[in-house]
Amino acid sequence: MQQLVQQQRLVLNQRLVHGLCLLQLSRGDLKTEVLRAVQRNPLLEIRPSSARRTGKACYLSLGDRRERMRARDRFQQLLENQPDKQVDNIRAVLREQVFYQKHEAIVLDLACAFIQMLDDHGFFSISPAIFQNMCGSMPTALQEKIPQAIALIQRLEPQGCAVFNFKESLAVQARLRFERFSDPLYRCVINLLTHHSELLFCSDNMCDGRVSVHALTTQINSMGLCVQKVSSNDVKDILLLIKELHPFPGKCVSNAQRADTNMLLEPDVLITKTAHGFVTQINCTGIPTVVFRNDYCMHSKAAEKNHALKACMHDALSLVSMLSYRERTLLDIAKTIVHYQCGFFDHGPAKLTPLRMTDVAHRTGLSVSTVSRIVRDKWLQYGSQHFSLRYFFSPRVLSTEEYRDRSSLGQNYPSSPHSKVSVKYRISRLIQEVRTQRISLSDRRIAQLLGEQGIKCARRTVNKYRSELRTCSSS
């Protein structure tokens, strides 16, 4: 008896891979990619601005002396509002996420201990032999929890930490990101990075040379690394997927901190307050406007028979469509952030509410991975201040009861209306208020003062936040 089975799956193609890459590009990288695409494709051109077409000069007009004084005050406020840079490292970022995971306390404690052994790349700073001997000397109850603790760290952002080298990191990232897809090329990527990394990298160090697409295609087919025969285009897609992974995940944190130290930033999103609420706009200044050249196709002879021209046409239309989709998606996510964080824009950091990427994804109808790609390296300007979009995603604060039973997070306790950023801001204000009186507040006293403001916060949480704020603690 014959059976008809209908299966729905995501099939990888060049356009999908390129679109995913465009979503996560920063403003500067996007401009570079657009200019590079226009140089390669004759069917694309950059539309000049109206000022360039008319030949008029672009300048800021300040009408009277009062307006000039206001502009000077705004610039002075911009200089004074530059925050004191506090550089985090990969260990601090991972340790913060472990605190909110739903696991047994023994697994969380093991994970925190292993995180302390990581270097700035996110790799273990000791050799595998020493690590194995150390784990072998632990009690049996702890040894049984070691795989769970390592797997927990590897799933945290940035993914791929708690390994010994970049090859293991890439294999872990590929498994976590691509294992849920049924497309054979995803399976091939996992197989390559897990069992046959020597085909991609010549040594334990990063290979500077490029991988030969033709040679890799032959090796994959001859060794049967994919369930189906792969072509050169398939291998190009495989290499693009691998390029999405980060060989040194710890550098993601250091690079983000380095970007934060730049004095001048070009925001991707502009927020302005009006009498009717907040207005969200995409900052198009400095980003080239790409258009499709219909006249080129009309004057080209035998355009339908020219396969090269048809390929350029397909790439041009795809790029214009993906840039439009990127702009719409960024605008939708920015509007959603403003919707959830309107208290922050009205009253400051003390009113920043807890927000997860899952909440934004649910409201916009997007996937969590798409939201994560969009907010990466994107900046928002409100007044004279700049904020990273990731700044608005802040976890909630744990109460004393939750701290005692961390394995029941999200199950037996209601969600807290206070975020980590808002509580840290309130703690810094409390410390500043008593500093002039030469009074030292203990962690327990700060927890009591926060409780009087309606914030149930554990003493250990206060101690952790004071350490991040670099303020001395007196128990």
From Swiss-Prot:
Keywords annotated in UniProt? DNA-binding, DNA-directed RNA polymerase, Nucleotidyltransferase, Sigma factor, Transcription, Transcription regulation, Transferase
Q: Does the keyword rRNA-binding apply?
A: no
Q: Which GO terms describe its molecular function?
A: DNA binding; DNA-binding transcription activator activity; nucleotidyltransferase activity; sigma factor activity
* InterPro entries (alphabetical): RNA_pol_sigma_54, RNA_pol_sigma_54_core-bd, RNA_pol_sigma_54_DNA-bd
Chain residues forming the annotated DNA-binding region: 356-375
GO cellular component annotations, sorted alphabetically? DNA-directed RNA polymerase complex
What processes does the entry annotate via GO biological process terms?
A: DNA-templated transcription initiation
Where can the motif RPON box be found?
A: 458-466
Q: Which PANTHER family match?
A: RNA POLYMERASE SIGMA-54 FACTOR
Under the heading NCBIfam families, the entry gives: rpoN_sigma
Tell me, in a sentence or two, what this protein's role is.
Sigma factors are initiation factors that promote the attachment of RNA polymerase to specific initiation sites and are then released.
Family, per entry: Belongs to the sigma-54 factor family.
Protein name, UniProt field: RNA polymerase sigma-54 factor
Which organism is this protein's natural source? Treponema pallidum (strain Nichols)
